[in-house]
């Protein structure tokens, strides 16, 4: 996910800035309302990223509503089975094209490297380019399996 990089405050070879982050805490409840477990995730403050410096492209294709209606109409009229899926923590699976640096998570600063920052290799929640990185990763995977995106909707993949 990341590696520690030393930062010289006087001269920095990094073209991008160091993004700060914060912890987001949540508690999950059981159906009866009792506490199931606590959850925590590190979220970077992507709203501080600067276009052209910290990221380039952010566009990620999203399936068009008309495409969903058309596919469901075909499936119903031809009695095809319909399946769906969800990728847990999808945005964390995207590979980054740009160099992105963030501070070490509060409470998890490496005592041997306190002046280092994290060079991210994968996207994190909050990054401007996280949706695009995920889309590129899943599209490449589907292409490897033999699926192709259609001309009418880049988010509709068909198996040839």
What name fits each language-model region?
Residues 1-160:
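Long, low-complexity, charge-biased intrinsically disordered regions
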């Amino acid at each position: 996910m990341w590696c520690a990089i030393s930062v010289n405050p006087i001269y920095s070879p990094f073209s991008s800035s160091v993004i700060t982050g914060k912890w987001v805490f949540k508690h999950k409840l059981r159906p009866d309302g009792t506490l199931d477990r606590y959850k925590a995730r590190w979220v970077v403050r992507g709203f501080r990223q600067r276009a052209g410096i910290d990221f380039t492209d952010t566009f990620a294709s999203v399936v068009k509503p008309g495409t969903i209606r058309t596919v469901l109409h075909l499936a119903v009229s031809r009695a095809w089975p319909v399946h769906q899926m969800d990728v847990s923590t999808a945005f964390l699976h995207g590979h980054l094209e740009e160099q992105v640096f963030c501070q070490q998570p509060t409470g998890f600063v490496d005592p041997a490297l306190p002046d280092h920052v994290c060079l991210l290799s994968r996207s994190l929640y909050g990054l401007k380019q996280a949706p695009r990185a995920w889309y590129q990763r899943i599209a490449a995977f589907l292409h490897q399996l033999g699926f192709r995106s259609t001309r009418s909707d880049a988010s509709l993949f068909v198996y040839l």
